[in-house]
């Protein structure tokens, strides 16, 4: 466990955003007008001088999943805002790897965006091949129960994303064959190997969804990179999802999980299998248990 110093700005104009710095002295590089939009400031070490901000200590591992859970538990929050650091002196903690981190000077622009959700949603990211569809040449749906399960997730205030390492043509053709078009808010394709950084995107006007490839350099030294939340978080912001409660990955490959709040590692499906109820229960149980533990009564968007 690491001990983090948390400075709490109860007068912040915008709630839930977190600025992470290496040390207290780095705050001298941030203008006061910018700090007014930051509710929490986090760093390791002690406060070097007197401050008007309230102070707490948080014990959490230096990894994002544990940090997010313990931070929300300590401050009784149902969700967190964006993570910021200093472009001129970025924080170097492990928890920031593969998470979307903004320069603190971008905050005034970011907080001006209107969110499409009044209550922050849960985000569920699905793999496609051998997760939702079979590995057959003529693909089939894994289990017909998937359709109703996705509808239920929508009713639970979830943003549903699809991330396939297949090319766009494969994704579009497969979704059409198994009639999964229209279920996903964001669809990502390609980007499995380091060096694939096309920035192309194409809008499907019929289903109001964007097919996008993944234009990110990731902090992973591997020929087969995992499904970094940084990519999903970037497109959520583009989709005007400013805040979210949790992010879940549903995938047959355990190596694709990195920093997700929840991971459902299901079995592969070379051919159809009647088992979706098992995996769907795991997804829903996590969401419902979370909403009980972190109720929305604590939700504040702007004050």
Spell out what each predicted region is.
Residues 1-126:
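Non-catalytic pre-domain segments flanking phosphatase-related domains
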Residues 238-248, 253-303:
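Asp-based, Mg2+/Mn2+-dependent phosphohydrolase catalytic module
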Residues 135-138, 171-176, 198-201, 256-262:
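A short acidic (Asp/Glu
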Residues 150-176, 187-193:
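Substrate-recognition element of Asp-dependent hydrolases with the DxDx(T/V) motif
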Residues 5-7, 20, 125, 161-164, ...:
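A structural signal for short, well-ordered beta-strand segments and their strand-loop junctions
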Residues 172-245:
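Substrate-recognition "cap/lid" segment bordering the active-site pocket of phosphatases
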Residues 140-149, 222-234, 276-289:
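Well-ordered, non-membrane alpha-helical segments in soluble/globular domains
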Residues 117-139, 252:
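Asp-based phosphoryl-transfer active-site loop
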């Amino acid at each position: 466990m690491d001990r983090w110093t948390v400075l709490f700005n109860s007068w912040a104009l915008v709630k839930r955003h977190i600025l992470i710095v290496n040390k207290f002295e780095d705050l001298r590089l941030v203008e006061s007008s910018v700090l007014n939009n930051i509710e929490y400031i986090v760093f390791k070490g002690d406060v070097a001088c007197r401050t008007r901000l309230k102070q707490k200590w948080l014990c959490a591992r230096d990894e994002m999943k544990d940090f997010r859970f313990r931070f929300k538990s300590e401050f009784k929050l149902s969700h967190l805002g964006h993570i910021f650091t200093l472009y001129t002196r970025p924080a170097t903690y492990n928890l920031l790897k593969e998470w979307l981190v903004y320069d603190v000077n971008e905050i005034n622009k970011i907080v001006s965006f209107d969110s499409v959700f009044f209550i922050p949603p849960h985000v569920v990211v699905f793999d496609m091949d051998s997760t939702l569809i079979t590995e057959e040449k003529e693909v089939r749906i894994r289990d017909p129960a998937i359709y109703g399960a996705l509808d239920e997730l929508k009713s639970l205030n979830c943003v549903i994303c699809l991330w396939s390492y297949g090319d766009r043509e494969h994704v579009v053709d497969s979704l059409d064959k198994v009639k999964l078009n229209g279920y996903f808010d964001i669809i990502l394709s390609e980007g499995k190997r380091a060096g694939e950084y096309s920035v192309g995107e194409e809008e499907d006007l019929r289903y109001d969804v964007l097919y996008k490839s993944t234009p990110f350099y990731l902090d992973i030294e591997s020929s087969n990179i995992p499904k970094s939340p940084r990519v999903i978080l970037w497109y959520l912001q583009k989709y005007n999802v400013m805040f979210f409660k949790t992010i879940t990955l549903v995938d047959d490959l355990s190596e694709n999980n990195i920093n997700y709040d929840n991971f459902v590692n299901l079995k592969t499906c070379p051919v159809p299998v009647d088992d979706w109820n098992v995996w769907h229960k795991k997804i829903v149980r996590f969401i419902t248990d979370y909403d009980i533990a972190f109720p929305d009564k604590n939700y504040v968007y702007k004050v």
